[in-house]
From Swiss-Prot:
GO terms for cellular component: plasma membrane. The keyword Membrane applies. It is found in: Cell inner membrane. This is Divalent metal cation transporter MntH. H(+)-stimulated, divalent metal cation uptake system. It is a multi-pass membrane protein. InterPro entries: NRAMP_fam (IPR001046). It comes from Yersinia enterocolitica serotype O:8 / biotype 1B (strain NCTC 13174 / 8081).
Amino acid sequence: MLNSRVVDTPPRTSRRIKLSLMGPAFIAAIGYIDPGNFATNIQAGASFGYTLLWVVVWANFMAMLIQLLSAKLGIATGKNLAEHIRDRFPRPAVWAYWVQAEIIAMATDLAEFIGAAIGFKLLLGVTLLEGAVLTGIATFLILMLQKRGQKPLELVIGGLLLFVAAAYIVELVFSRPEIAALGRGMLIPDLPNRDAVFLAAGVLGATIMPHVIYLHSSLTQTAGENSKADRYASTKLDVAIAMTIAGFVNLAMMATAAAAFHFNGYGSIAEIEQAYLTLQPLLGNAAATIFGLSLVAAGLSSTVVGTLAGQVVMQGFVRFYIPIWVRRTVTMLPSFIVILMGMDATRILVMSQVLLSFGIALALVPLLAFTGNKELMGDMVNSKLIQILGKLIVLVVIGLNAYLLVSLI
């Protein structure tokens, strides 16, 4: 039946179906290039040059597989990950999962919101508090698009993702990294000291985002008129394109920081504002301005995605709904508190990414269990190879977290 349908579908129509179903992965991918990534990648590149590029490469491959599994769960079952946990786990475990998922979502939003505020401060010369107010207004305006349906939001967020990617192509041209050394950094694993382990955990936490694991399964769970086969075929292409773009941006961030800072004697740069001000004399005003614009674009789009993920988490785990503007208002409060207390914003960004890395396994374990369940997934159940790869990812994440805890004690 499926084969005959594929044969009978005209190629142009099939392409239109694939294109019309693409978009959810671009929303998820924004979570992989948020300001937390800027902070960790800049610090990693400035401190260790190209040494930690391999972490970005492997984390991005892991992220591709994870997001594909999340999307597949929504397509195959019509339910998202949080709903499946609610239906199958004991009530105390469900509440515990909900609490940790909300904490992860708030830590994520803290990084994204403050990052956008820093971007406005650098570009417009306003205070960080004024930048936060501008960020709040802008995110409310973007969230209003949701009233028009999911597709307009996908287009806007996808456009912002492409803008950030284009910005970093320009930054790479300005910084002129050494290609051979860059290639070695991407291919040869190395963790020279405890600081490198800390930053590697931060890069992992910034690259694999627990909140978008929950969100992606929600974005694909609505059936529509297309078959599961069509939707899954489109999703594979969607994930491949979106996550490749996100992976390139992360590599470009770290490579630019390495070329511009580490190899010019600025290895101690650890703050986004410091990076912006140092870029001006090193690479020119244009490079610094593009950096600031990309930070604002990444911050605004990712904080919107974080708000959507928070809604999915709350509704999925505890069936409780609050208006999205209420959630947006509440989740802005920690960012304003951090700013008003005068805390180190970039340090908060990096610490939030390390915290995120501890939430990855908690989302991955049930995701693997559900997508490996033949009764639940039917023909879309994971193959043995996918299950093995998924378990290896869980072990890597848990191992890195354990090593990090021991290193910090």
